[in-house]
């Protein structure tokens, strides 16, 4: 693959992951997967939540794509774009974790934005959490 194709694949995957996250949150986490997601909407002092298992699902998706793209794993059957799709999923997971768990829920650091887009993002998420039930 050319460098431009690699970059476009990583960026396209990153962007596509926003749709995957939105739709899985709406239809899975607040649907049949509510059992894992419920504790994310309830106050607690635990370091981890069942909801964190969804992060592991994302990690498995990324690792699987890395494996599909790896000649070390699949030999001549490796599909090179898999590596770059896996990287796009990985980058999305890192950004999502830093923004959602770090900035919004302050699990890793304490910083409350006073203005701008970051403040609006935190406010919108708090409004989402104000909803009781699924």
Description of each model-found segment:
Residues 6-11, 82-86:
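Hydrophobic alpha-helical transmembrane segments
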Residues 1-4:
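Short, strongly hydrophobic alpha-helical membrane anchors
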Residues 17-134:
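Membrane-embedded catalytic scaffold of the fatty acid hydroxylase/desaturase
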């Amino acid at each position: 693959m050319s460098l431009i194709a690699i970059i476009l694949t990583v960026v396209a995957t990153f962007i596509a992951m926003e749709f995957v996250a939105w739709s899985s949150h709406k239809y899975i986490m607040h649907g049949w997967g509510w059992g894992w997601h419920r504790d994310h909407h309830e106050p607690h002092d635990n370091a981890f939540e069942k909801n964190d298992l969804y992060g592991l699902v994302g990690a498995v998706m990324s690792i699987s794509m890395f494996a599909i793209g790896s000649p070390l794993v699949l030999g001549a059957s490796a599909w090179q774009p898999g590596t770059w799709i896996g990287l796009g999923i990985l980058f999305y997971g890192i950004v999502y974790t830093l923004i959602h768990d770090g900035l919004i829920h302050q699990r890793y650091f304490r910083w409350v934005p006073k203005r701008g887009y970051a403040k609006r993002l935190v406010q919108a998420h708090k409004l989402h959490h104000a909803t009781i039930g699924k």
